[in-house]
């Protein structure tokens, strides 16, 4: 069936409208798979230290409270990496930042396997974290810019669940890898996997077409990219544009734009929400295997329970993304945060029943990881192209202070003889704060970018 003549004959076309009108192509699915794999290996490496900690403490003869700096080092690096990578990606491109970040976290993860003491490991995990912090938000940003508006939240949330799946996979496989091959093996896996994937990113993954358009890139390059998605629509087109290119311009400083009248309130509330959510997630991710060992669980069972918590985010991704595209996305996420706090509280009351404990940990993982996985999608749809990578990355970077705090406060509470039940009960506070912050954003700054 021929397309209307004015579509083919126009010399200029809105590239986002082209994406919105076309069915999802194999090319977009390929981009989704590559970005999924990027955040998957990011998740494995991010979670590695939490699963390694019990074996490392035993091997090196150190007390669990001494592991606090090691547990937090990668998170500190992730802050640094995220804050730098966002503006860099908005200036130089998403793809080049992705390549560099994967080389960094892959290389230093390999080096971590050969660390001989805690001080060396702290340095190597910090450097690994720089790459980890840069990779995840930029993969999210790049993929979101290839999604049609009608299902963007669903697709981005499903892609981002690769992060949770990676963290869960780290837990499941560490249960047999560490006893069989030693704690070094998980670092080796976390190093070689991203280095191998970098080859695919270099030769297959395209740059964001929106970035190329806004930065005044080569029209022919944009045409080649979009021809994989809607070949019949780009014939004869001499200029591609996107809404914000014509209405906002491309010369503004991306970081300054986050604090403009349009974005300032929403930016601060996104940061607060992400911060509080990561307090909950990283306290549990970093210390759940160790805490489970303290209750008498075997290393294999402790790793399995930790993996089960992360797997919950994979289970909820489809529903959360679907709901965000159909209802107020802020209130969907707020509901998941609050329910997560309730489940964390009930987990603390169920330590004597292993079966019920596993079910409740899965439910807590479904709620908190589902909410947190949806935040990059919410951020990506809030900011326009000129500051999208910066917005997503700075939410991730500032939020990582919550991750550092969560990992650190776990060591402090354990050192002060808090029980597992006490710690889990306390998590209701940051979970409720996250729910309140994102709900408030729905009232004061709800508008999506064009």
Please give the residue ranges for each predicted region.
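Intracellular cytosolic loops and amphipathic helices of Major Facilitator Superfamily
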Residues: 1-21, 205-262
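Extracytoplasmic gate region of multi-pass secondary transporters
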Residues: 49-50, 259-317
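Conserved MFS/SLC helix-loop-helix module at the cytosolic interface between two early adjacent transmembrane helices
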Residues: 80-119
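Structural signature of the two symmetry-related core transmembrane helices
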Residues: 96-110, 331-346
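A membrane-interface helix-boundary motif in multi-pass transporters
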Residues: 179-192, 414-429
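Multi-pass alpha-helical transporter architecture, strongest
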Residues: 200-204, 428-450
């Amino acid at each position: 069936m021929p397309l209307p003549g004015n579509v083919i004959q126009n010399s200029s076309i809105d590239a986002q409208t082209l994406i919105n009108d076309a069915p999802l192509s194999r090319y977009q699915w390929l981009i989704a798979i590559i970005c999924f794999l990027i955040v998957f290996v990011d998740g494995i490496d991010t979670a590695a230290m939490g699963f390694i900690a019990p074996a490392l403490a035993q091997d090196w003869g150190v007390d669990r409270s001494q592991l606090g700096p090691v547990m937090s080092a990668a998170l500190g690096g992730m802050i640094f990496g995220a804050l730098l990578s966002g503006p860099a990606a908005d200036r130089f491109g998403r793809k080049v930042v992705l390549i560099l970040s994967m080389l960094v976290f892959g290389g230093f993860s390999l080096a971590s396997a050969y660390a001989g003491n805690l001080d060396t490991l702290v340095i190597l995990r910090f450097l690994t974290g720089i790459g980890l912090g840069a990779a995840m938000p930029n993969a999210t940003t790049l993929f979101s810019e290839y999604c049609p508006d009608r299902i963007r939240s669903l697709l981005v949330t499903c892609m981002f669940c690769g992060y949770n799946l990676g963290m869960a996979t780290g837990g499941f496989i560490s249960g047999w890898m560490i006893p069989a091959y030693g704690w070094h093996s998980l670092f080796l896996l976390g190093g070689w996997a991203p280095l191998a994937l970098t080859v695919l990113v270099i030769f297959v993954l395209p740059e964001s077409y929106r970035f190329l358009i806004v930065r005044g890139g080569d029209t022919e390059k944009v045409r080649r990219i979009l021809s994989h998605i809607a070949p019949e629509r780009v014939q004869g087109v001499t200029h591609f544009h996107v809404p914000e290119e014509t209405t906002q311009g491309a010369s503004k400083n991306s970081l300054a734009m986050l604090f403009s009248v349009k974005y300032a309130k929403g930016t601060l509330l996104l940061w607060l929400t992400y911060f509080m959510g990561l307090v909950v997630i990283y306290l549990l991710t970093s210390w759940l295997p160790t805490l489970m060992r303290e209750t008498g669980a075997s290393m294999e069972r402790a790793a399995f329970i930790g993996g089960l918590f992360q797997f919950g985010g994979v289970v909820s991704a489809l529903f959360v993304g679907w709901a965000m595209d159909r209802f107020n996305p802020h209130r969907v996420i707020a509901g998941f945060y609050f329910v997560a706090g309730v489940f964390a509280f009930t987990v603390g009351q169920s330590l004597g029943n292993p079966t019920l404990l596993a079910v409740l940990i899965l439910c807590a993982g479904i709620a908190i990881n589902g909410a947190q996985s949806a935040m990059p999608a919410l951020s990506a749809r809030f900011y326009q192209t000129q500051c999208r990578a910066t917005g997503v990355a700075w939410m991730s970077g500032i939020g990582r202070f919550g991750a550092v705090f969560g990992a650190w406060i776990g060591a402090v509470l354990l050192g002060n003889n808090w029980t597992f039940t006490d710690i889990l009960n306390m998590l209701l506070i940051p979970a409720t704060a996250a729910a309140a912050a994102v709900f408030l954003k729905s009232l004061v700054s709800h508008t999506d970018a064009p």
